[in-house]
Structure formats: structure tokens, C-alpha cells
């Protein structure tokens, strides 16, 4: 009898799953197909083809895919190779507390599949739950003064390292990374800063005092270590994360994922001090063969006069973790990170770590998330970049390094525990 098993059936999205098929004919060719319906009703699909061993088994931890959406030994390939049925759709989790993503995995006889359409019922199937929050994590809506967001607290009395989580130009409130960080032991504040509730849809300036209030709010919490907070930032959020690290003594560890070393778009203001954005070169915006916009050439930080717009990163006292995808088509993130590191070196600083991933794109998400290489954002068809397999490897490695970095620099005396 053919059986399809998965362990665990219900897990956090950053946890691997062991999938195995048994009871097959020795050396039978089979196809594993996965599907997921997101919160908007959009479908995502993946497939991979395998040959059973002499015992009639296919163990995805050891077997090599011979075709489909990936080839080789990739135990979690069915997850990170999911592709949207509707082009330019990004998989986003909004409701992290109440509903997991459900991934259906079905097993077919490969000979019965013609033109990628299933010709008969699956030989076996199962449904997996992929959660963005662990049991016991609490979510507290934040509406204190100007602050808008959601605070996620791990189970237990604490104390916990505190982290502020910042996304980019999409706006609104994205909680999935903060909820996962809380599931891994961090008190995590998912902080909105535009296009959410009563916050401006398109702010004219970035007010750094707002983020200072967020840092103080987190440090005041009785379950949070009071020695300093961390920041995890991506894209547009990176320019804010950098400024926080420079100007706020409360920030002691900053993760910068695919961002710039200068403000862009709008000025930054802090206690009356104005930092103007680097002008962009609109003529350098390009469109690729698929009609997707590529923005990574639009900021020229080596041009005459550009240095006045760069952040004085050498003034920061905390630690930096730069994470860059070398295949990023939205921001020239590797060049910007290397330029920032060059500033630090020239000032005798060694408070930085660089993780640079060949083949990874702009949207480096938690492990096993599907690559989104392009999507429609604010009516723009943007090319984010990335290649499926190296991007997946980057996500898995970076997530571990982010947690290690934050624990090392946010938990007092953690070095004595290593």
C-alpha cells in the first residue's frame, strides 16, 4: 500500500519537514506536487519528479529530484520552489496568529501525467500546516502615543532580547518576521511607519524621533533586557535602521538586508537636523525583456558630491550585520554595503559582518519561503531578482545568522554561554 508521510505535519515555517513515500513499485517514477492557497485566494504550485529506490521508497531527505521545478537533493524544495499561478504575485502572510498556511502535497504516478496536467487521482496525499507563530507567543496591538504596530512576546517571564522589525516601501504592517522572531525567543516589535491606520500614506519626511520612541517603548517593557535593542530592517527600512544605529544609543545591534547607505526619496529629520536624500538618476531606470522595472542602477554613490548624502556610519557604536543578495535587481545592495564597510574601515572600526550571497535576490525572507523574483508593488512591475536554489540557500543560512547575531549582541554576557 502506497503511503505518503511528513514529519512534522504542523510546524513553524522556518522548520524543515521530512517527506517520504513508501509502498511504491521498485524504481517507479513518481511526481510530488505541492499547492498552497494564500489569504487572497491566489494559488501557488510546485512539482518534482523522483525515481523510487529498490525498496519502493522515495525519501526527500536523500533522493535526488530528476526534474520538475528543481533538480538534485533538496528536502524542502517543494516549499521554496512554489510559484504563483497568477504572475507577479508575492506570497505574504498577514494573519499570523489565527491561521497557518496549508500546503497540500500529492503523489502521482509520473506516467499518468501528460502536459503537466494530472490524468488521475493521486496515489496519496496529505496536508501540512505552516505556522508563523509558536504556541504561547502573545500578540499585543501597539497604539501608544504616535506608535503603531504589534508587539510579539515569547512565552515565559523573560527577560528577552528586544528587536524592532522594519519592512520597506510596501507600507502597512507586516508581522510575519516579528512573530517568527518571537517564536525563537525575541520580544519583537513589528513597527509600521507609513500607510497604516492614521499614519501618513506618503510621508514628506522620515521623523527619526518616531523610531526613538519605539526603542524607548521596547526598553521600558518589563520582559525586555534594558541594555539595548536590536533592529532588523530590509529595503527602505535599512536607511531607517542605519540612522537608528547612528543616532540612538539604545540601538546596539542592527541587521541590514538589501538596503542603501544613504536616505532616498524623502529627507530624514532628527531633532531639527535634516539629512537630505541622495538624488536619483531616473534615466538609469531600466526595463528588462519581460517588461519588469530594474532600479538598482538609479543611485550613483560614486558621483561627485554624493558623499555628502551618505550616512556617517562610523559614528555608530553598535554592531552591524549586512546581508546582501548579489542578484538584487532593485537596489545595488552589495555596492552600498561595501561602501558603508569601507567608511567603517577608514575610521578603524571592525563592528560589522557582511554576508553576501551569490544568486540571491532582493526579498530575502525566512527559510523555505518561495522566491519572489518579481511582483506588482504600488502599480509598478518590479524585478526583485534572484535564482531559486541559491536564493533558498541564502534564506536558510541568513535566518540562522540573524538570530545568532542578535543573541550575541543583545543578551548580556551571552559570550560566557557560548
Curated annotation (Swiss-Prot):
Modification Phosphoserine, positions: 125, 416
Reported effect, residue 386 to R: In FHCA3; uncertain significance; contrary to wild-type, undetectable expression in hepatocytes
Record-annotated active site: 235 (charge relay system), 328 (charge relay system), 362 (charge relay system)
Source domain of life: Eukaryota
Effect caused by changing residue 362 to A: Abolishes N-acyltransferase activity
Transmembrane domains' residue ranges: none
GO CC, one annotated term: peroxisome
SUPFAM superfamilies: alpha/beta-Hydrolases
Tissue specificity statement from the Swiss-Prot or TrEMBL entry: Expressed in the gallbladder mucosa and pancreas. Expressed in hepatocytes (at protein level).
EC number(s) reported in the record: 2.3.1.65, 3.1.2.27, 3.1.2.2
Compartments in which it is found: Cytoplasm, Cytosol; Peroxisome
Keywords: Acyltransferase, Cytoplasm, Disease variant, Fatty acid metabolism, Hydrolase, Lipid metabolism, Peroxisome, Phosphoprotein, Serine esterase, Transferase
Catalysed reactions, as listed in the record: choloyl-CoA + glycine = glycocholate + CoA + H(+); hexadecanoyl-CoA + H2O = hexadecanoate + CoA + H(+); choloyl-CoA + H2O = cholate + CoA + H(+); chenodeoxycholoyl-CoA + H2O = chenodeoxycholate + CoA + H(+)
Gene Ontology annotations of biological process type: acyl-CoA metabolic process; animal organ regeneration; bile acid biosynthetic process; bile acid conjugation; bile acid metabolic process; fatty acid metabolic process; glycine metabolic process; liver development
Single GO MF annotation: N-acyltransferase activity
InterPro entries xrefs: AB_hydrolase_fold, Acyl-CoA_thioEstase_long-chain, BAAT_C, Thio_Ohase/aa_AcTrfase, Thio_Ohase/BAAT_N
Pfam families to which the protein is assigned, alphabetical: BAAT_C (PF08840), Bile_Hydr_Trans (PF04775)
Purpose of the protein: Catalyzes the amidation of bile acids (BAs) with the amino acids taurine and glycine. More than 95% of the BAs are N-acyl amidates with glycine and taurine. Amidation of BAs in the liver with glycine or taurine prior to their excretion into bile is an important biochemical event in bile acid metabolism. This conjugation (or amidation) plays several important biological roles in that it promotes the secretion of BAs and cholesterol into bile and increases the detergent properties of BAs in the intestine, which facilitates lipid and vitamin absorption.
Disorder: Hypercholanemia, familial 3: An autosomal recessive metabolic disorder characterized by reduced biliary secretion of conjugated bile acids, fat malabsorption, and fat-soluble vitamin deficiency. Clinical manifestations include rickets with variable growth failure due to vitamin D deficiency, and coagulopathy due to deficiency of vitamin K-dependent clotting factors. Additional variable features include pruritis, anemia, hepatomegaly, and bile duct proliferation on liver biopsy. Laboratory studies show abnormally increased levels of unconjugated bile acids.
Family as reported in the entry's similarity comment: Belongs to the C/M/P thioester hydrolase family.
Subunit details: Monomer.
Protein's recorded name: Bile acid-CoA:amino acid N-acyltransferase
Source species: Homo sapiens (Human)
Lineage: Eukaryota, Metazoa, Chordata, Craniata, Vertebrata
Gene this protein is translated from: BAAT
Amino acid at each position: 500500500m502506497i503511503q505518503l508521510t511528513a514529519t512534522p505535519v504542523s510546524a513553524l515555517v522556518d522548520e524543515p519537514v521530512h517527506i517520504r513515500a513508501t509502498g511504491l513499485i521498485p524504481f517507479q517514477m513518481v511526481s510530488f506536487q505541492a499547492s498552497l492557497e494564500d489569504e487572497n485566494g491566489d494559488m501557488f504550485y510546485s512539482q518534482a519528479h523522483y525515481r523510487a529506490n529498490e525498496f519502493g521508497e522515495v525519501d526527500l531527505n536523500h533522493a535526488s529530484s530528476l526534474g520538475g521545478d528543481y533538480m538534485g537533493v533538496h528536502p524542502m524544495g517543494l516549499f521554496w520552489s512554489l510559484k504563483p499561478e497568477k504572475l507577479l504575485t508575492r506570497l505574504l502572510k498577514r494573519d499570523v496568529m489565527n491561521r497557518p498556511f496549508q500546503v497540500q502535497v500529492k503523489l502521482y504516478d509520473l506516467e499518468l501525467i501528460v502536459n503537466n496536467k494530472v490524468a488521475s487521482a493521486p496515489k496519496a496525499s496529505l496536508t501540512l500546516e505552516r505556522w508563523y507563530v509558536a504556541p504561547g507567543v502573545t500578540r499585543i496591538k501597539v497604539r501608544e502615543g504616535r506608535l503603531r504596530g504589534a508587539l510579539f512576546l515569547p512565552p515565559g517571564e523573560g527577560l528577552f532580547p528586544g528587536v524592532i522589525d522594519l519592512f520597506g516601501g510596501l507600507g502597512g504592517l507586516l508581522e510575519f518576521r516579528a512573530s517568527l522572531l518571537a517564536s525563537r525567543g525575541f520580544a519583537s516589535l513589528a513597527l509600521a511607519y507609513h500607510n497604516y491606520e492614521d499614519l501618513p500614506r506618503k510621508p514628506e519626511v522620515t521623523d527619526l524621533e518616531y523610531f526613538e520612541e519605539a526603542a524607548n517603548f521596547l526598553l521600558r517593557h518589563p520582559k525586555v533586557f534594558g541594555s539595548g535593542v536590536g533592529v532588523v530592517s530590509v529595503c527602505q527600512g535599512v536607511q531607517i535602521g542605519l540612522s537608528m544605529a547612528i543616532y540612538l544609543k539604545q540601538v546596539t545591534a542592527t541587521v541590514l538586508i538589501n538596503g542603501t547607505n544613504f536616505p532616498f526619496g524623502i529627507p530624514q529629520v532628527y531633532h531639527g537636523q535634516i539629512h537630505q536624500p541622495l538624488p536619483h538618476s531616473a534615466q538609469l531606470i531600466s526595463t528588462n525583456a519581460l517588461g519588469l522595472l530594474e532600479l538598482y542602477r538609479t543611485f550613483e554613490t560614486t558621483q561627485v558630491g554624493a558623499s555628502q548624502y551618505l550616512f556617517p556610519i562610523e559614528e555608530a557604536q553598535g554592531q552591524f550585520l549586512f546581508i546582501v543578495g548579489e542578484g538584487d535587481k532593485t537596489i545595488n545592495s552589495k555596492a552600498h554595503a561595501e561602501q558603508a564597510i569601507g567608511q567603517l574601515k577608514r575610521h578603524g572600526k571592525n563592528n560589522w559582518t557582511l554576508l553576501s550571497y551569490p544568486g540571491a535576490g532582493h526579498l530575502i525572507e525566512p527559510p523555505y519561503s518561495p522566491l519572489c523574483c518579481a511582483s506588482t508593488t504600488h502599480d509598478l512591475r518590479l524585478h526583485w531578482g534572484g535564482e531559486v536554489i541559491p536564493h533558498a540557500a541564502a534564506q536558510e543560512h541568513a535566518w540562522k545568522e540573524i538570530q545568532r547575531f542578535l543573541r550575541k549582541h543583545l543578551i548580556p554576557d551571552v559570550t560566557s554561554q557560548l
